Amino acid sequence: MGRDIYKDETLTIPKGVTVDIKARNVTVTGPRGTLKQNLRHVDIEMKKQGNTIKFIVWHGSRKHNACIRSVYSIINNMIIGVTQGFRYKMRLVYAHFPININLTENGTVVEIRNFLGERITRVIKCLPGVTVSISSAVKDEIILEGNSLENVSQSAANIKQICNVRNKDIRKFLDGIYVSERGNIEELEE
């Protein structure tokens, strides 16, 4: 297999969003706030031309060419984050012992009590920019919201992971906190 001499991908920047690229440090600013991402470790040429960004790889191998789409997706998710935001909904699942959730420090720290009847309190600090709220419409549901997809999804994963059932048959003990729905905070009007 030979190498591709040139491969590129183009991302269009929507109105109301500004993207700054300096030495592969990307800053995206929109109506919901600002997100920054350091992409210096990726050997890709990024050029901003008007309202588009062009990602270029010269003489790239198969894995090097795959980096183009990864960087494209990262920056596209940042643009969606500063325009619409991200929301994850998680459901509390229990058979016998009801799981209690307390939110502290303005919804950035989650305390889980009475998981499988245990007396231990499990504490999860959410990543920066993520706020947690308890749903008023649905019983036993928490909502994670933020601008950064990476931070919101990793915070949801941390909450799910701390409630793993150990030393028991997981087919029988289905207790835990699971992601039930994910999407955007503000849906675009078509």
Curated annotation (Swiss-Prot):
<dbReference type="GO" id="GO:0005634">
    <property type="term" value="C:nucleus"/>
</dbReference>
<keyword id="KW-0687">Ribonucleoprotein</keyword>
<dbReference type="InterPro" id="IPR000702">
    <property type="entry name" value="Ribosomal_uL6-like"/>
</dbReference>
<protein>
    <recommendedName>
        <fullName>Large ribosomal subunit protein uL6A</fullName>
    </recommendedName>
</protein>
<dbReference type="GO" id="GO:0005829">
    <property type="term" value="C:cytosol"/>
</dbReference>
<keyword id="KW-0689">Ribosomal protein</keyword>
<comment type="subunit">
    <text>Component of the large ribosomal subunit (LSU). Mature yeast ribosomes consist of a small (40S) and a large (60S) subunit. The 40S small subunit contains 1 molecule of ribosomal RNA (18S rRNA) and at least 33 different proteins. The large 60S subunit contains 3 rRNA molecules (25S, 5.8S and 5S rRNA) and at least 46 different proteins. uL6 lines the binding pocket for eukaryotic elongation factor 2 (eEF2).</text>
</comment>
<dbReference type="Pfam" id="PF00347">
    <property type="entry name" value="Ribosomal_L6"/>
</dbReference>
<dbReference type="GO" id="GO:0030684">
    <property type="term" value="C:preribosome"/>
</dbReference>
<dbReference type="InterPro" id="IPR002359">
    <property type="entry name" value="Ribosomal_uL6_CS2"/>
</dbReference>
<dbReference type="GO" id="GO:0019843">
    <property type="term" value="F:rRNA binding"/>
</dbReference>
<dbReference type="GO" id="GO:0022625">
    <property type="term" value="C:cytosolic large ribosomal subunit"/>
</dbReference>
<dbReference type="GO" id="GO:0003735">
    <property type="term" value="F:structural constituent of ribosome"/>
</dbReference>
<dbReference type="InterPro" id="IPR036789">
    <property type="entry name" value="Ribosomal_uL6-like_a/b-dom_sf"/>
</dbReference>
<comment type="function">
    <text>Component of the ribosome, a large ribonucleoprotein complex responsible for the synthesis of proteins in the cell. The small ribosomal subunit (SSU) binds messenger RNAs (mRNAs) and translates the encoded message by selecting cognate aminoacyl-transfer RNA (tRNA) molecules. The large subunit (LSU) contains the ribosomal catalytic site termed the peptidyl transferase center (PTC), which catalyzes the formation of peptide bonds, thereby polymerizing the amino acids delivered by tRNAs into a polypeptide chain.</text>
</comment>
<dbReference type="InterPro" id="IPR020040">
    <property type="entry name" value="Ribosomal_uL6_a/b-dom"/>
</dbReference>
<dbReference type="GO" id="GO:0002181">
    <property type="term" value="P:cytoplasmic translation"/>
</dbReference>
<keyword id="KW-0539">Nucleus</keyword>
<comment type="similarity">
    <text>Belongs to the universal ribosomal protein uL6 family.</text>
</comment>
<keyword id="KW-0963">Cytoplasm</keyword>
